[in-house]
Amino acid sequence: MAAAKKAVLGPLVGAVDQGTSSTRFLVFNSKTAELLSHHQVEIKQEFPREGWVEQDPKEILQSVYECIEKTCEKLGQLNIDISNIKAIGVSNQRETTVVWDKVTGEPLYNAVVWLDLRTQSTVENLSKRIPGNNNFVKSKTGLPLSTYFSAVKLRWLLDNVKKVQEAVEENRALFGTIDSWLIWSLTGGIHGGVHCTDVTNASRTMLFNIHSLEWDKELCEFFGIPMEILPNVRSSSEIYGLMKISHSLKAGALEGVPISGCLGDQSAALVGQMCFQDGQAKNTYGTGCFLLCNTGHKCVFSEHGLLTTVAYKLGRDKPVYYALEGSVAIAGAVIRWLRDNLGIIKSSEEIEKLAKEVGTSYGCYFVPAFSGLYAPYWEPSARGIICGLTQFTNKCHIAFAALEAVCFQTREILDAMNRDCGIPLSHLQVDGGMTSNKILMQLQADILYIPVVKPSMPETTALGAAMAAGAAEGVGVWSLEPEDLSAVTMERFEPQINAEESEIRYSTWKKAVMKSIGWVTTQSPESGDPSIFCSLPLGFFIVSSMVMLIGARYISGIP
């Protein structure tokens, strides 16, 4: 029997999409942008202490190998020749910090995830050293001093992890965000691996000057970071190195394929949504929620709590584009919390069913400030609250309130962006895993009171990385010229409530947010003395209650 004929599809491009919750490898047809096959692996998060969030860098790397291998197997089953994969792009969770040993290839500590809060006291101490009239950190980086970004995570590792300290002293340490760790490992690791990052990921470290597009000596001195451990900064679209066979990757079919695209996940989604024009914006619903608006070649500094960041630089000789960004820490993560911590759902998909049963939160509001509040508040003292509960409230109302919370947070950052840009968005382009939830998308349209537009192919983050890789000089299989970009079919959600009702719900949400702020300081019980009496009002209440109880027993004659 003759072997099945391989399908001829033209050049293919692969994309590693390494997120906070999962890793995926996807393969696209570079001529049509069609997704041909993919594989996904969920990634564990570790919570060793209150407010700490870590991941195992080796597990992340192994998940990439597994996804590549399984996707190649699936392509084989479809009779698609994997030798047609001409390039690979990488998109990644940003800010998450890894330090590893370049001699052994071993991570020196777990990856400290972007959501992690352990550096709050470091941030407070550093903020005292910034002159009030000269915030050089924000003017150079576009970022507020926050636990969110890599510099303070790296500072914590240098201060607290002996292995990291020793490796730095012995010139064995390399630092990187997840993209750097993956590219170094995939291009050979200890056998000539390429230590690099791209401008979008570098711009999230708080060590990178977004004007000069270089590591900044003054910033490195301020945070006490040795510059020799930093990766080389490259554009988002160029050949960084070639795939090398690993003992962890059974099939060596992708050996020699160039890794030629790299963008932080939110920049990748901006490219994948084809927001190449000044003023175009997208909102990605993943573990967190991230609204980016392309501001062209101009750095626009927000007066309303948004970040200024590098959007992309698609080639060594191509211009840099900037973006305004509103970041929400907890979006999809609240669904995972309802599943793993409260146990009111068994799978993420169940939340849509629960919310649909009631169609309202019945006055229940959920502020999921598990890692403080990001834009537009930048308030690390906030913690999650559920308020407006009655005896009637059940798990369906809480599920609905959780979805509403994602939409309310998006409304806050959209309002801030409209004020900064001066021109309100007429519609919102969306992407990310949560957009498959139709209840969420309709709620978002109702709360914003503008249409929400969702592409039929939701994998825009991976698509953006693939586009950057395929368009790189020396690869040239993907044209980014407007006339060559494939048209994308869209699903549209129109507002279905009146504007007055939308405003009432939003203003009540804002009241709930105010109640979530001020719960924690670095001197609070969660980081210090666990004694109940470190809360003076509570201690006084307990003591006075005991005195009253003893007095009552005495007066009534009870022995």
From Swiss-Prot:
Positions of ATP binding: T20, S21, S22, T287, G332, G433
Residues annotated as binding ADP: T20, R24, T287, G332, G433, N437
EC assignment: 2.7.1.30
Pathway: Polyol metabolism; glycerol degradation via glycerol kinase pathway; sn-glycerol 3-phosphate from glycerol: step 1/1
TM region(s), chain numbering: 532-552
Keywords annotated in UniProt: ATP-binding, Cytoplasm, Glycerol metabolism, Kinase, Membrane, Metal-binding, Mitochondrion, Mitochondrion outer membrane, Nucleotide-binding, Nucleus, Transferase, Transmembrane, Transmembrane helix, Zinc
Binding-site positions, glycerol: R94, E95, Y148, D265, Q266
Molecular function GO terms recorded: ATP binding; glycerol kinase activity; metal ion binding
Role description: Kinase that plays a key role in glycerol metabolism, catalyzing its phosphorylation to produce sn-glycerol 3-phosphate. Sn-glycerol 3-phosphate is a crucial intermediate in various metabolic pathways, such as the synthesis of glycerolipids and triglycerides, glycogenesis, glycolysis and gluconeogenesis.
Record family assignment: Belongs to the FGGY kinase family.
Protein name: Glycerol kinase
Organism of this sequence: Mus musculus
Gene: Gk
